[in-house]
Regions:
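A general secondary-structure signal for short beta-strands and their flanking turns/coil
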Residues: 125, 231-233, 359
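Inter-helical turn/loop elements of alpha-helical hairpins
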Residues: 97, 140-347, 351-354
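Short, intrinsically disordered, charge-balanced linker/junction segments flanking boundaries
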Residues: 358-365
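Short secondary-structure boundary elements
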Residues: 2-211, 215-224
């Protein structure tokens, strides 16, 4: 059993002897871990980390069963938020002003199930955060909810978070995407997943951005094809381009697949800033594959889009693309002419934001 297994086991048990023994015993009984011919313990994939061992589940059920029914309901709603939750969100979902008091009392008990983990403000309102003392408490409470209850509570939690953070400059877009996704509400889930992915791009959290934006694309695939749907997909895939190239390289299969789909969408849609950014992304992928002619052709398309929109930033990208492609192809005079024009119209104050969108430094080098 490698270090990754041991770290994961510890994260689920916190080193608690009973939990550790029962977790490992359950894996042995399910043959999730078994001895190899060499006598070493090995794992099968995927491991059922979320399956609570029977004896542990019985202990948790006994502890929770001793709580007042109102507090049990509070904690069940809290479990929908995850291991850490906000008391005010639970109170709003339950429409019960007594939630905060019950959680405060429970957090002070000797054998408490939750503990305070901080406070922050949502506008002028104070919000209190709690954490389940162990992830297994949260998993047990969430696991005993019916499928209908999960859908309902995820929707209520999502709409409550929307209301609490309305007008906020930094809403919890990751949480909102998760709750609407789990509630089966595809359109708001896509909206918030796109925002969460774009925020991850700005933070250079490329692997996280890829994970979130791929999920947005998967959800979009469930919707009927319309021009509005295509525009949203184009926006998602443009946001994906930079992180995919950062994680897997310019010519990775995922980046190429994303690029092919972008090409289809660009051909369908009218000129726009997003179409221009998509074409620019195509030039990056083509250029690293030494496809000089194709790079020049797509860059000229980008120049045409920029002219139709009278968009200086897109014109910089298009001229640079044509200029570099012509230079690589040995047509130095033509290449210099385009590069010179791009250099002259480049405005760092106007064009600097593109690096956050494309994952590329934009402008003269």
């Amino acid at each position: 059993l490698d270090a990754g297994f041991r770290e994961q086991l510890y994260s689920y048990t916190d080193g608690h002897p009973l939990l550790t023994v029962e977790m490992v015993r359950g894996m042995q009984e399910r043959a999730d871990i078994r001895r190899s011919r060499a006598g070493l313990w090995t794992t099968s994939e995927p491991l059922a980390w979320h399956q609570i061992p029977t004896r542990v589940e019985a202990v948790i059920a006994q502890r929770i069963g001793r709580l007042p029914s109102d507090l049990q309901d509070d904690l069940a709603v809290a479990a929908v938020q995850g291991e850490e939750f906000v008391a005010e969100t639970v109170a709003a979902v339950r429409e019960d002003d007594g939630v905060a008091g019950r959680l405060r009392v429970e957090s002070r008990m000797p054998h408490r199930l939750v503990a305070p983990s901080g406070a922050f403000r949502i506008g002028d309102q104070l919000a209190t955060k709690y954490r389940f003392r162990h992830i297994l408490f949260q998993r047990y409470l969430y696991g005993r909810l019916t499928a209908a209850d999960r859908l309902r509570l995820h929707e209520r939690t999502g709409t409550t978070l929307e209301a609490l953070h309305r007008g906020s400059a930094d809403p919890p877009v990751v949480d909102l995407a998760h709750h609407f996704d789990e509630a089966g509400l595809v359109k708001p889930a896509i909206t918030y997943a796109l925002l969460a992915g774009q925020r991850a791009v700005r933070m250079a959290a490329n692997e996280e951005a890829v994970r979130i934006l791929w999920r947005a694309a998967e959800l979009l695939d469930t919707l009927p094809e319309t021009p509005q749907r295509d525009e949203r997909e184009l926006e998602i895939r443009v946001s994906l381009s930079g992180p995919l190239m950062a994680v897997g390289g310019y010519a990775s299969p995922e980046a190429l697949r994303n690029g092919r789909r972008l090409r289809v969408l660009c051909d369908r849609l009218d000129p726009s800033l997003t179409v221009g950014l998509a074409l620019s992304g195509q030039t990056y992928i083509m250029s690293v594959r030494a496809l000089c002619s194709e790079t020049a052709d797509v860059s000229r398309e980008l120049v045409a889009v920029a002219e139709k929109l009278n968009h200086g930033t897109l014109r910089v990208l298009g001229d640079f693309g044509v200029g570099y492609a012509e230079t690589w192809a040995g047509r130095l005079s033509a290449g210099h002419r385009y590069l010179r024009r791009a250099y002259e119209i480049y405005d760092p104050d106007r064009d600097g934001w593109l690096g956050l969108v494309t994952g590329q430094a934009v402008g003269p080098e």
